[in-house]
């Protein structure tokens, strides 16, 4: 049975709050250099995404609560042209994140060529909201949603040469400077 949820993303300078049916699902917060802190509020998981490598890079996901490795995402050499990221989840389970259009407004997760999660952003409203459909709500669904949003945001920033959300990021810095 397919389940549908609405989602919304709010952000300030490199910090994103992801709401699922208006309930805070989690946060994505840019750390130092090539790290992101991902907190899944619903389950209390605290994760660290670390990008290592230059040409053949990978994103390693570590659970900060237990210290164990959750998985690894292989980044294509030319991610601008190739819209698939392979995710090897703990236990050797393989999944693929697929961007369905150039800027990744529509993306999905596949396991064994079956779609387990699909997201479509409503670009008409322009408020970073949309619909997420799940084939079934699994234990790792929250992780897949936040990881997918992370990959989508990463791709949008790379493809727009850093201009994606630039006005919002600059407005946030001006607001901080006015208070000082």
Model-derived regions, located:
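Low-complexity or membrane-interfacial segments used for flexible interactions
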Residues: 1-35, 44-45, 68, 81-86, ...
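Short, solvent-exposed loop/turn segments at conserved positions within beta-propeller repeat blades
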Residues: 9, 52-55, 79-80
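Short, well-structured hydrophobic secondary-structure segments
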Residues: 38-69
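Beta-strand C-termini and the immediately following turn/loop, strongest in propeller blades
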Residues: 51, 74, 97-99
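Short, conserved, surface-exposed binding loops centered on an aromatic residue
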Residues: 61-62, 77-79, 87
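Acidic (Asp/Glu) and glycine-rich low-complexity loops/linkers
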Residues: 75-76, 148
